[in-house]
């Protein structure tokens, strides 16, 4: 392993983490702007041009706030909870293929922190660990509302992970791989998986809302019942970590949706661009294409938040266990039959 490879990977890893954090930060600004647009308001417009410096102002505010710690028997777990939630949100970005290779300085640089064969399985494993961050934070807060919110979040996320995993089986039966890069490469042009697996896409999209605790599945932190949910007792940057993790998860789930079902970094005419314009230009445009798809899904997340009311908890569980899981199993059966008959 030469030093150039170590430097290359270090730069890519730092860039990927920086991109994830930057998108999570500016998603807060976008959320407020989208809410203002849908409610016929202006939104944040004081800090910088168009309010573009508002995320920095919010970050400084959180840094400067006083930290309150409840009278809890385990202060270590109170600190570990938000750290786990934040860490798992960033770790999932490591296997996302942000584009194809760039040829720079005589080397082929992969726009991915690491390319592993079981990337999809890695994402499911890391996301499941994120449940511990919420559960530990709620339990260590020594507050009944925090604990109730944490239990809700844990049961919701575990329940919808089942449906999400089953929705992926039908897609994996078609692609034959767990590698996100290979799945993306198979969708060159407009050969997108969403046209072949619309049911898997719909189930995965609904489960993504539940996994990120977004409206209409934000039962873990609904203000009318649980004050602030599992982060009721948190303040300053500990609370900021929980909020940051939510937007980072929203960004990563949007990237996964774009890669699995909408071609990832592929776009119509990409092969022509490679042959006639150049590999680097074509692949930079591929990164921009993926970024546009991700922004489209992020806007959809925010649009849904301000247009659809919150479900009741029994409706949430009914949808997950009695509708989505049977539908995902039926989709697996239909996909298997179609592969046997037509492939």
UniProtKB/Swiss-Prot annotation:
Name of the protein in its database record: NADH-quinone oxidoreductase subunit H
Keyword tags: Cell inner membrane, Cell membrane, Membrane, NAD, Quinone, Translocase, Transmembrane, Transmembrane helix, Ubiquinone
Subunit structure: NDH-1 is composed of 14 different subunits. Subunits NuoA, H, J, K, L, M, N constitute the membrane sector of the complex.
Domain of life from the UniProt record: Bacteria
Keyword Mitochondrion: no
Membrane-crossing residue ranges in chain numbering: 5-25, 76-96, 119-139, 158-178, 190-210, 243-263, 284-304, 323-343
Enzyme Commission code(s) on record: 7.1.1.-
Protein's organism: Flavobacterium psychrophilum (strain ATCC 49511 / DSM 21280 / CIP 103535 / JIP02/86)
InterPro entries: NADH_UbQ_OxRdtase_su1/FPO, NADH_UbQ_OxRdtase_su1_CS
Designated gene of the protein: nuoH
GO cellular component: a single term: plasma membrane
Its job: NDH-1 shuttles electrons from NADH, via FMN and iron-sulfur (Fe-S) centers, to quinones in the respiratory chain. The immediate electron acceptor for the enzyme in this species is believed to be ubiquinone. Couples the redox reaction to proton translocation (for every two electrons transferred, four hydrogen ions are translocated across the cytoplasmic membrane), and thus conserves the redox energy in a proton gradient. This subunit may bind ubiquinone.
Annotated catalysed reactions: a quinone + NADH + 5 H(+)(in) = a quinol + NAD(+) + 4 H(+)(out)
Top EC group: translocase
Family, as annotated: Belongs to the complex I subunit 1 family.
Keyword field contains Transmembrane helix: yes
GO function term, MF aspect, one: oxidoreductase activity, acting on NAD(P)H, quinone or similar compound as acceptor
Membrane topology according to the record: Multi-pass membrane protein
UniProt record, GO biological process: aerobic respiration
Main location, first listed in the record: membrane
Locations listed in the record: Cell inner membrane
